[in-house]
Regions:
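Conserved catalytic cores of ATP-dependent inositol ring kinases
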Residues: 1-217
């Protein structure tokens, strides 16, 4: 397995990759708002157990042990999960992908997620058992889990990739940590650590002063 990263122009603010650029190919699960189409009533992210969850922008729907969606409106989507148990979901438009939440405490949300794809891949998000000890893949706002970035991905043959991040004080949420991808370790196999790695480095964010439709350093 090899990482598949890409530079994407979003037109957004000045960030680590420069004005308007973002890094693609980094999967994540994050809190998202309820919608009228799915939940009957639109909502907003409140950083509570009642928040909804999305995998790469696609809504996760709670299901029972047979994979049947629970009755709507669903509750506790973003709640922590008791030790030895899990909560199961399906992506809204992909019934063949199985998502489970594990761990966590109080109202802080799950500790990690495991995602099984139809092609045999197992992808882990957050502070999962297979994550590198310094992965920092669960991102918090005042202790509450805000997003869970991919920490490990493995194929059906046991080949795997690990992802490591930096957390820093940001501006997206009240008292929140933001994150950047620092390193990708790949060519790992069952019983053998990855022998190759991709390290992302930068010279800092270049700021600019904008006037009408032009910028100057």
């Amino acid at each position: 397995m090899v990482p598949k990263l890409a530079l994407i122009y979003t037109g957004g603010p000045n960030r680590e990759l420069g004005q308007g650029w973002a890094l693609g190919g980094v999967s994540k699960i994050e809190r998202c708002a309820a919608t009228k189409a799915v939940d009957g009533v639109p909502g907003s992210v409140q950083y509570k157990n009642s928040d909804k969850l999305c995998l790469d922008g696609q809504r996760l729907i709670q299901v029972d042990s047979a994979g049947v969606p629970l009755a709507f409106p669903q509750s506790g989507d973003a709640a922590a999960v008791a030790s030895g148990s899990y909560r199961e979901y399906r992506p809204e438009r992909d019934s063949l992908t199985r998502v489970r939440a594990y761990g966590g405490s109080g109202s802080y949300g799950p500790a990690y997620f495991m995602v099984w794809s139809a092609d045999g891949r197992l992808t882990e998000y957050g502070d999962s058992p297979g994550a590198a000890t310094d992965a920092k893949a669960r991102h918090l706002a005042s202790g509450v889990g805000v997003s869970w970035a991919v920490s490990r991905a493995a194929d059906s043959s046991g080949n795997f990739i690990q992802y490591l991040y930096s957390n820093y004080w940001g501006y997206s949420f009240t008292a929140a940590y933001e994150w950047t991808l620092d390193e990708v370790r790949y060519t790992g196999t069952a019983g053998q650590a990855p022998s190759n790695k991709l390290v992302l480095t930068g010279e800092g964010v270049r700021s600019c002063k904008c006037k009408v439709n032009r910028c100057s350093p």
